[in-house]
Each structure stands twice: as structure tokens, then as C-alpha cells.
């Protein structure tokens, strides 16, 4: 079915059942599936494909040749009804692909607000992304990955399935991430290592200078190899320390205490 409303180009194809706000703009040769919902002021440039049971929040803009809501790239997927939810004011640039979930991962892929997905980036099935995330050109996020708020991922990065990327962290270009990344950390290298605290990110979020200094001290204490304490003992010592009252320190400790399928990216030994 072709709809020719004022904001929908006559060459666009919108299937029966799609829910599209009157304020949306749909450009030439876009294809919108029957289970798609587009909230207010969503803008699609030309040749965008939105499929599956997909909700896209208000103010989100999608550039040409992106495929959003496509079936999961998972051999176990057998056609079950799963979903993709995208929040408000996201920028999805050219040739981006984002998949719906699978039954094995809860059935939902979710993305928060104010994220930027640069050209050629990919978000796999069952991923959970927070707000204010930047994923640079041609980076690929495998299935079941959790990315917390305010994360910046450089170009040509690959993130292995089931990894967790902590809040406020920064991953340098070309990294192959196969372990969890601690909040507020800076990760560099093709075989990535923890190079320190993401000072720029902390300043941007408005962290106090004295709190940043204490967080740097916590990182040093966690990964120093002096004395007889093992890593778990060092972590527990900080858990009972007055440093634990600092918001950023508390986030780091709680992240590291959670159960995970992966270990942590650590400094080079």
C-alpha cells in the first residue's frame, strides 16, 4: 500500500497497520512494516527500512539505507514475535542496522534517548542501551550486550556478546572488546587494556574535582599488586571504606560486584 499524505513521499511504502504520527516525515523509497509505530516528529530520509514490531520515539532521525527492526542475526531464531524499542531524539546515520530481540534474550532490544549511531554501526539482538551513547563508524555490538549511559565507542570497535559496558566509559578505535568495561574508564588498544579514568567524560558530567581524584585513587587500589590482598579482598575493602559514599565510586564497586559472564578489562601487566 502506498500512502501519499503531505509528509510521506509518494514512493514510500507503508503497510496497513503501521502507526505513524501526523508530524512524521517519511522520505523517498522508505519501507515501513505493519507493526511499526513512529512517534511524533520522527524523520526518515530516503531508502530507510523499518520492520518488525518496532517503536521509535519522538524526534528520532534516520538516514538513508538503514535497516531498523530487522530479524535477529541468530541461528536459533525461529520467527517468534520479538520487539525493538528506540527512545527519543536519537540520530541513526547511514547504513546502520539494529535487530529485534530473541526469546533467548528476553525478546526485546532497547535503546534509550539522545544516542548517536554513526555510519555502518550495528546493534545486535537483545542489547540494552542507555542514554547519550555514541557509537562511531562501522562499530558492531553483538547480541545481549548492555551499554550504560554516556558511553563513547570509537570507530571499528567490536564488542563480544554478553559484555557489559559501564557508565561513562570511553573505548578507543579498533578495540576488540571481549570483557566487561568498568564505569568511567578509558580503554585503548586492539587487544584492549584499561589505561585509566575517563577524565574528560567525568568533567563533562560535572563530577567534582576532588571526587575525580578519589576515583583515580580507587582505580589504583583495585589494580595494584602490592601486599598480600587479592582482587576480591581489595574490592571488599573499598566497599567498606568512606570512599564508597562517592557516587562514582559506588557505581564502579556495584558494577564489579554484579554477576557477569565476563571478567574485566584490566591495566596492562
Predicted regions: what they are:
Residues 3-193:
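Structural signal for interior beta-strand "rungs" in well-ordered beta-sheet cores
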